[in-house]
Amino acid sequence: PWWSMFLQTEFSDDDVNSGGDVRMIDAFITFKPRDWFQLIGGERMAPASRQNLTSSGALMTVDRPGSNNYTLTWGLRGQTQFNNSAISGTRGGSVGDVSVRDLGATLFGSTSTSEKLHFKYYAGVSDGSTARTSDEERFTLRAQVNYGDAEPGYFGLSTYLGKKQTLGFGAAYDTQSDFAADSVTGESVDYAYWTVDAFAEQPIGPGSLTFEAAYSDLDLDDTQNPLGNSIGDPLSGGVNADQTQGSGYYAQTGYYINKWQPWFLYEDWDADGNNDAGDWSAYRVGLSYFFAGHNANVKVGYENTDNKTPGANDIQTFVLGAYITF
């Protein structure tokens, strides 16, 4: 069919959404007259990074890297405890009408110029942050190229469990003018985020090696005071914006063999705040066993987060989880 609809819900009980509620997290319609020309409209993931476009049912290191939350509607913050809790001293506070996702439309397409060379693009417009009453939209662009096997869908996986041989490179740019205000001076603040990423999955020895890395940069107009709304009130939980603005990277790898996959992740964020305020790094190490691929598996992992903000505590987390997708 040339069109389809997708709905996804979750049970919400966190510090952003009201607890104990079932809420919609994806609700979009896809029009697909051609592979290279598709329009996705509704509540969906803005294509601001590779991890934004990685299926939540196929994350290699239990959850997404904590540094992925510096994109606009993810709260402009670092995350710890396997991406379940904000890192103290990093939170910018920006959210949209819907948390993490955004309301809007994305033009998407994928094509191949040969058996081995594949391309895809994204061009999105969304509501973005609702802190200000301005009508400025959020614009997001992404392009990706793969050599070897294609990753043709709107979403991808963080590991294909040995089913692909591919090398991919991507880049994205995400921006919204006048998305917030300086809560002290009242001056308008613009948001800009860019990232470059690399992904590889190749057979090595009796198994398959997966590797992914990305570098990201967040610009909040060099604002030093907390971000605010249209009437100057600071955004919820927001720290000085220079503790959020900055750049960082992550790298993760895993080796899949006989349904087992040991994995490791390291990430680092260097904020512009004084005296290391907003700086942090983290590593994860773990092991997964796949009963039925990504549809049924068990993961065990340990994460250590080094929060370099003065007076903040480091965080250690151990997790054991069973994951079933149907």
Kindly label every feature range from the protein language model.
Residues 2-4, 38, 116-120, 136-138, ...:
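Outer-membrane beta-barrel architecture
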Residues 56-62, 227-235, 279-283, 316-319:
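Flexible, surface-exposed loop regions and adjacent strand-edge segments
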Residues 112-114, 203-205, 292:
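Short polar/acidic secondary-structure junctions
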Residues 139-146, 150, 314-326:
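Outer-membrane beta-barrel "beta-signal"
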Residues 144-148, 152-272, 281:
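Detector for outer-membrane/organellar transmembrane beta-barrel domains
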Residues 253, 264, 287, 300, ...:
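Hydrophobic, well-ordered secondary-structure elements that form the walls
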Residues 294-320, 325:
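Predominantly the C-terminal beta-signal and adjacent terminal strand-loop region
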